[in-house]
């Protein structure tokens, strides 16, 4: 229970090394405990759960060539290259929740079904100019773009600043606390950061109670909304 509390309540999470010292076990055992705890952060999605003004965006998690020795640098790994990075896609409701997924790529055929699965029709969707978003159903959604390449980041209500702030917290948690996370286990860490974002307005005791409820059964987003309202 002590391990659960520290993982849930620490702003940037807890590394396996830190956890091993807190509970008095080996780092290997602490790492296993950490994965089991992270499993309890995922929320089940059965139907669209976000509505209103929605920001969608993708980011890339992975090592940076500038931090590597010359012999270890990955060739052509800049920008949206997936050679050395793992893409993560997110949908975020302003003044609401975020839903984020580790994805295989950032093509329209991958991202659009995730949007349709999480966002209610008639919502306004804000995105950057990434080509995958061109296929968003304009009959069901009001799709508005922000053209970052032209130096535009906020035009009236149009922006993706909120979800970019979420990405910043996610990357700080990974690089600052865990230093490195494999593709295989990345979704658990994404779920962990999403849980913190979605319960940020709760007190420590309220947040921990939501976590405990999710250890007994996998909560749906509709249930999480009722609990955190």
Predicted regions and their residues:
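Residue-level recognition of single "structural anchor" positions
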Residues: 1-229
